[in-house]
């Protein structure tokens, strides 16, 4: 069986069928966008943005084999890549950002009885991120990635219809490449002697019970025991002895979680949750640039695991025989052991090493309200979702100890979708999204002293990028089904009003009037901001 589609921006194809009748089957699917190909005629060699573009492709495959009535094997794989490139000859700048994931998994399902089920998995995953930038006689390449080897076993036991018990264990071996850099400035070339890597072991045991205590009250209680060990060499400064020493540490924690649902009546209920969580892998991001240069850093002796407490409570109501669903939910999350780059530190300054001098440690919180209205029945269906939230950070060594918004703080997030069945053959659809822009830190001035560039910044995350919003509309025509062939035609317009949503902002050095950029030697230089948009 084949299923596919050819569009103006992308194409897809899915193949599936039996390998051995009643024994095994397969599915293979792939996608590829070709925005980069379509944009080439509009970006000739005379265009300042020639060489810019974006595309992604992915491939998914899965094979399942029925060993017996109680045993099944599944082998699956995924490979995907996104590639973004930007060039502006007016500023003599070029940026390339390829990234993606690859995973392979082998899964065995076994049914012990009608009450006990087991799922065992072996998983390998590979994440790669690369950032390349070149301007005038300066070049920089940052590479980071994570390889994970994971094995886990999960059990599901259902003694009766009111009680479901889950328990299991998992282990992951991590290999980090948190940030390796190569570069060139004029005739000076920087090449590390070797690729810098870190290694760690992470394991967990868990148990949870989902039980209906009464017809009105349902409770889910769980407990997770987690452990983490950093097994690679890492150096930290001993400020008393004024020297760097190798140090490692093991972390072990208990993570409880509790959720409940209480039915007030057949159409309304209250839901609540409390969770504790330890995160052993940190996202180290810098707000000094809005480029996607975030790096993943493992916990160690000098970098403790991130800890969070989260509370949530919500009211849910269905109306008109479940035609409408409504919900309002509030949450509060408190976090400790967060990391941020110190003032003036960029990811490229800390690649090929892992000194604690690069990071500051602090706290944060996140809270908000989520609203949902959904229509499930009738010719016209859809939903409206809105989130009002705030996420802040507190660091003694950052922003003079004053509270500042997190890089990914999103004050407003709105989604509206609608689908209308015009007839048996025609379906109309639309999607509108709006989101507050990311917070970034702007450079106010740069000084060129002895060939080195020094930068002064505004307050941390004191500037908001423009909000992201767009409207998509579409129409799908499905002709009468033929004997062996089913087809449909989809007509859609992406970004109806041609909104230039920001992807990132970069800053170019602007020489004083009458001076060529490549001739800047000493003095003050004014950084000028440029916004880059993928679409339109």
Residue ranges and their predicted role:
Residues 8-10, 19-21, 32-36, 79-83, ...:
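Transmembrane beta-strands of outer-membrane beta-barrel pores
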Residues 7-32, 46-83, 99-118, 159-160:
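Transmembrane beta-barrel wall of Gram-negative outer-membrane proteins
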Residues 425, 434-451, 468-470, 476-536:
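C-terminal beta-signal and adjacent terminal beta-strands/loops
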Residues 168-269, 280, 398:
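Signature of Gram-negative outer-membrane beta-barrel scaffolds
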Residues 148-152, 194, 202-204, 300-304, ...:
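Outer membrane beta-barrel strand-and-loop segments of large Gram-negative receptors
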Residues 128, 175-187, 229-238, 262, ...:
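Surface-exposed extracellular loop regions of Gram-negative outer-membrane beta-barrel proteins
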Residues 331-334, 353-442:
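Gram-negative outer-membrane beta-barrel transporters
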Residues 70-148, 180, 186, 190-193, ...:
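Flexible loop and strand-edge segments within Gram-negative outer membrane beta-barrel domains
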